[in-house]
Amino acid sequence: MLKEEVLRLKREKNAVILAHNYQLPEVKDVADFIGDSLNLSMEAARTKADIIVFAGVYFMAETAAILNPDKKVLIPDPGAGCSLASSVSAADVLEWRRRHPNGVVVAYINTYAEVKAVSDYVCTSANCLKIIEAIPSDRPVLFLPDKYLGLYIKAKTGREIDIWDGECHVHAKITSPKITAKIKLYRDAEVLIHPECGCGTACLLELPKMGLSPKFLSTEGMVKYVKQSPARRFIIATEVGIIDRLEREAPGKEYIPAAEDAICEYMKLITLDKVHRSLKEEIYRVVVPEDIAKKARLAIERMFEFA
């Protein structure tokens, strides 16, 4: 079977497979680590493997390559892009900096290496609030590229933030009316929302008026939360692939997607067959030019200080 062959190749080649929470179940089945962007970046930084197969989208594999310049980082499908990462370029950031010379650029991890290289900090949804709150109040904050995450940060911290106009096309379709409709159907459910969602700010303001206390969490935060919560039913507002992970980690509970169509087609490009071929033939290596990697590494390492 293909699964057993992948496991055999991992042992022979001293390889590790890192799989994002949104990956297909068949890919998670052969992964050594499953997690969100922050956790997988940390695993990539400390792995002793010679080969890293990154089952995720391209910017994630780039981050692993930046942190492991001497290791072979493979992505099973180099076409696994990201609409959010593609919404901003290094040239855009440099022009933004020119207009705000005293600004501190905070780049969400969903950006390509060239953008990280011209940013001061990289953040994830798990540590963005800590990073923003650590920036001196007299320095303007330039946050990119996700406008919904930026608005959430602005609402939570009270900081004036200049926000880039980008979005994740998957999370953008998770709207406040969709959340409200699910709440009416499942009144006993806890509501867990990824801060990239299009509903974020509205839910932050409106749901408490309905007597609800929505939890805004990274995908890894969702996993931790459902494991310790006494609740038996949850409305999950993020890409639907996380539900498989939740069922693995906290079985016996009910997980209702806020939007059944919240599916990242880029994540789903990675299949078990492609993982097998990439590992067997050691193809689709991700290499970041050293001049870009060196600068991007600084911003990524600052992110780890707030992990």
From Swiss-Prot:
* Compartmental location: Cytoplasm
Keywords of this entry: 4Fe-4S, Cytoplasm, Iron, Iron-sulfur, Metal-binding, Pyridine nucleotide biosynthesis, Transferase
Q: What is its EC number?
A: 2.5.1.72
Residues recorded as binding iminosuccinate, renumbered to this chain, are H20, S37, Y108, I109, N110, S125, H194, P195, E196, T219
* Cofactor remark: Binds 1 [4Fe-4S] cluster per subunit.
Q: Which organism is it from?
A: Pyrobaculum aerophilum (strain ATCC 51768 / DSM 7523 / JCM 9630 / CIP 104966 / NBRC 100827 / IM2)
Give the taxonomic lineage as stored in the record: Archaea, Thermoproteota, Thermoprotei, Thermoproteales, Thermoproteaceae
In terms of Pfam families, this protein maps to: NadA
Give GO cellular component annotations, separated by semicolons: cytoplasm
Can you state which reaction this protein catalyses?
A: iminosuccinate + dihydroxyacetone phosphate = quinolinate + phosphate + 2 H2O + H(+)
- GO molecular function terms here? 4 iron, 4 sulfur cluster binding; metal ion binding; quinolinate synthetase A activity
- The protein depicted here goes by the name Quinolinate synthase
